[in-house]
């Protein structure tokens, strides 16, 4: 088991959530790729969208169904500060995951999630 998957497993176990973690043999960079790989509808996939607070630099995580988009203006209203795009390096630094593979749990640093 990779270190990334071990962090996800530890986070789930710590929250007393019993889920099977699937390792995909092929790319699941998009929600559509993930849905095809497991044989489900795109909206049954959870997508992790990360923004960076313009004033604070802190990252903020939004979870949404795979077929949905997160509206940056609405996300800004929810968070209460202007949000910008988080780049790949910041996402990996904060979560330990690469873009396209950010799990909803098991991040390297605590992240506010909505």
Q: Which sequence ranges carry the predicted segments?
A:
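Extended, low-hydrophobicity, polar/charged segments
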Residues: 1-114
């Amino acid at each position: 088991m990779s270190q990334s998957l071990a962090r996800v497993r530890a986070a789930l176990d710590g929250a007393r959530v019993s889920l099977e973690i699937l390792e995909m043999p092929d790319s699941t960079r998009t929600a559509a790729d993930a849905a095809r790989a497991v044989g489900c509808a795109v909206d049954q996939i959870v997508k992790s969208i990360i923004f960076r607070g313009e004033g604070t630099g802190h990252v903020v995580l939004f979870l949404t169904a795979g077929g949905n988009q997160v509206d940056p203006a609405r996300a800004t209203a929810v968070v209460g500060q202007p949000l910008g795009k988080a780049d790949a390096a910041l996402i990996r630094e904060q979560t330990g995951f690469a873009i396209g593979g950010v799990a909803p749990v098991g991040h390297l640093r605590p992240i506010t999630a909505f």
